[in-house]
Amino acid sequence: MASSMMASTAAAVARAGPAQTNMVPFNACRSSVPFPATRKANNDLSTLPSNGGRVSCMQVWPPEGLKKFETLSYLPPLSVEDLAKEVDYLLRNDWVPCIEFSKEGFVYRENHASPGYYDGRYWTMWKLPMFGCTDASQVIAEVEEAKKAYPEYFVRIIGFDNKRQVQCISFIAYKPT
């Protein structure tokens, strides 16, 4: 009993003492040291950083007439070999390839001003997801089959991670002419 009385009085004494230095109130990330008062004496503008004249070769993408769609749309059209490399990357990451197609290759709204199900965000899936696919040539063959069945439609390949339940990659495999 005496030992418990001693512990409670010691705790009361510890609480009554002044605040510790690490218990001061938060001071909103202010530094106690002011910024240096010295300024750069040189007002010469030639010392400013430069991108080395690369501005003259930069181009602005035209906002009309050349729509961009998916991940790789700023590249030139992908050849069959390029598509196979992308599908190999998709398969190496253990993603499930899926093929989708749509008449319109971009988001549009024709029925209502607010977003909805029929505004181009969801494409029609070509057959079923290719679970267990291990060869890029199988995916390319399905893309070719979709192109033959719907030559005026856009065809895209998506990579779905079935462990995390997310779509990880999506790119246009075929654009109609």
Curated annotation (Swiss-Prot):
Other information: This protein is coded by one member of a small multigene family.
Chief location of this protein within or outside the cell: plastid
Assembly, per entry: Heterohexadecamer of 8 large and 8 small subunits.
Regions crossing the membrane: none
Transit peptide (residue range): 1-56
Record flagged with keyword Transit peptide: yes
Biological process according to GO: photorespiration; reductive pentose-phosphate cycle
One Gene Ontology CC term in the entry: chloroplast
GO MF annotations, alphabetized: ribulose-bisphosphate carboxylase activity
Entries under Pfam families matching the protein: RbcS, RuBisCO_small
Entry's induction text: Accumulates to low levels when grown under continuous white light.
Keywords associated with the record: Calvin cycle, Carbon dioxide fixation, Chloroplast, Photorespiration, Photosynthesis, Plastid, Transit peptide
Organism, as annotated: Lemna gibba
Family, as annotated: Belongs to the RuBisCO small chain family.
General function of this protein: RuBisCO catalyzes two reactions: the carboxylation of D-ribulose 1,5-bisphosphate, the primary event in carbon dioxide fixation, as well as the oxidative fragmentation of the pentose substrate. Both reactions occur simultaneously and in competition at the same active site. Although the small subunit is not catalytic it is essential for maximal activity.
KW Transit peptide (keyword) present: yes
Protein name: Ribulose bisphosphate carboxylase small subunit, chloroplastic 4
Protein localization: Plastid, Chloroplast
